[in-house]
Amino acid sequence: MKQEKAYYHLPGSFEFYELYREFLPLFRTHREYFYDWCDIGSIYGAPADCVWGGGRAGFGEHDPKEVLALTREYGISARLTFSNSLLREEHLSDKKCNALCALFERENQVQSGIIVNSELLMDYLKTHYPQLYFVSSTTKVLTEFQQLRAETAREEFRYVVPDFRLNKAFGELDSLPQAQKDKVEFLCNECCWVGCRDRKCCYENVSRKNLGEACPEHICTAPGAEEGYRFSKAMENPGFIGIRDIQDVYMPMGFSNFKIEGRGLGSALVLEFLLYYMTKPEYQLHVREAIYLDNMLDLF
């Protein structure tokens, strides 16, 4: 069933609070700047020093109540990224993470969600915070289509983020029933090498760091790894999903959810994602001027 609206799930609710505090009013008051076929489905993230955290080592410092107040004001779902894959029973009693879940369950008028990897954690959360919904994390590295089919069939998950290497498996993706298509949340702008075999190890390294374990730094051996993340490089990735792909392929096929990564990047690059994926080209300069660009700004 063709979808009329694409929903973006945006990075850095804690990490880029100041950016969203400027961007969201603009998105509401100047809707003509932005594509009418897209909207914001959620903003995800986690504060620093959360043992349940995963995917990226969290560095967000903003007050959780202010984060929730901002998402509530604009009717956006807030998600906690609690995708640590190595949790043990003793970690479930962590006071900080439990307090965050209680807050997100209690105070957000739009239902909040948790991005999870650990079955142990999800079982605990279902019992203690039943009003939260669950997102199956891309850190599970679901690279086989049958894994994705099975995961989207699970009632526990409202959304499932597959590995980016399944993004272009169109024949198999189109075979999913509509109810399962509605759950698939594609990771659009991944820069990871398509031939990487260490992706799960990379995520596990982050999980160990968030648990406070002493561990060696994961060394990425992908071609060009020394350059770090570059959006131009991500656009050349075989799994990259651009705006034309979303409009011309995914939405007609019945898919409507798209995740933008970027929690570990800088706010300037995250703004470029918002410009590319959401903003009409003729208004991109207007958005830059509203957020940071003025006639006295020096770059050097």
Enumerate the language-model features and the residues they cover.
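Active-site pocket-lining/capping segments in soluble small-molecule metabolic enzymes
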Residues: 1-151, 156-300
